[in-house]
Amino acid sequence: MSAPQDRTDDGGVPVPVTPAGATGGAPAELPPSSPAGRGMFGDQGTGDVSGYGGLVRPQRSIEAATRPYGGYFDEVADALEEAYPAFGEAIEKVVVDRGELTLHIRPERIAEVCQVMRDDLSLRFELCSSVSGVDYLGADACRLHVVYQLTSMTYRRQVRLEAAVSAENPHLPSVTSVYPTADWQERETYDMFGVIFDGHPGLTRILMPDDWEGHPQRKDYPLGGVPVEYKGAEIPPPDRRRSYQ
């Protein structure tokens, strides 16, 4: 498949296809770092990082982008705003980072936005290739984020949608009626993170047993273990240092 060619606007001025910040496959310049995090996953406990090899990682602060976003990103935003009357209320912020576009959506609006993204002729995001969860423990009240990767095979474009809910009220509308491919992926996100997708046709666990307690990829989920025997020697279960509490 040949590389996409630059287009021109109505005045004949070339408009680059490559989004702003992208540098021919290399990541765009990173935003400023906030104070470094120590340990793993924002552990706020004793500060004992011996189990992680003394890992120290920078924490980046990603701010909302301003116009122009660059390339087709502005076209996508304009088309969605024109096709969806509740655009101003539904879109919490727009982020352009490392040459990728992410639209942060109010949780109750996610299914509506997906419907417009799929059906509008100027958008045509026919495929939801991924639904996944992220736990930003300690970041804010809405720590559970669900990420939707949308692809337009018509226009060869990709956009990411993201919605955030709290651990106390982890409800999101299911998008399975719009994207059937989201069925098992929503089940996995429910299983691992405890996000409840209202309207899903069969929201049951998909990896863990039905009677399993808790959601293993939440960062406040304690590690456990069972004793294992090796050649007559009994190895005790691991400690619970990574309980993230």
Swiss-Prot record:
Localization per Swiss-Prot or TrEMBL: Cell membrane
Composition bias, Basic and acidic residues: 1-10
Region (Disordered) residue spans: 1-54, 216-245
Disulfide bridge partners, by residue number: none
Name the UniProt record assigns to this protein: NADH-quinone oxidoreductase subunit C
Assembly with partners or alone: NDH-1 is composed of 14 different subunits. Subunits NuoB, C, D, E, F, and G constitute the peripheral sector of the complex.
Topology relative to the membrane: Peripheral membrane protein
